[in-house]
Design a protein with these regions (language model features):
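OB-fold nucleic-acid-binding modules
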Residues: 1-16, 20-21
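Upstream accessory/linker segments immediately N-terminal to the RecA-like ATPase cores of bacterial MutS
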Residues: 6-12, 26-99
């Protein structure tokens, strides 16, 4: 589903595909990390967020295609998915998404 046409907020989890635009790791305080990955397509963008999972930063790099499955929320003026399931490389029509 194009990111821009996904319902926000989504009552059910949705599958969106996009290209990684940025990867950012924040450390707001000792013992806490927040990983934010911005993915976008022609219709819009969504920020994927994980808490205390810094190892996931190695899985993403700018320019790669990603499929994300989760509930979309509207937070801080943008679409956001918290702790979504992801697949690197996006999805083709023949593939299914395995969480």
């Amino acid at each position: 589903m194009p990111i821009g046409s996904a319902p926000t907020p989504s009552p059910e989890p949705v599958l969106v595909c996009g290209t990684v635009r940025s990867v950012q790791e924040l450390r707001p305080r000792r013992g806490m990390t927040i990983l934010k990955v911005l993915i976008a397509d022609d219709s819009g963008a969504v920020e994927l967020t994980w808490f205390n999972q810094p190892f996931k930063k190695k899985l993403f790099h700018v320019g790669m295609d990603v499929a994300a499955f989760g509930k979309i929320e509207w937070a801080y003026g943008r679409r956001q998915m918290n702790s979504p399931d992801t697949e690197q490389g996006g999805l083709s029509q023949e593939q299914g998404f395995v969480p």
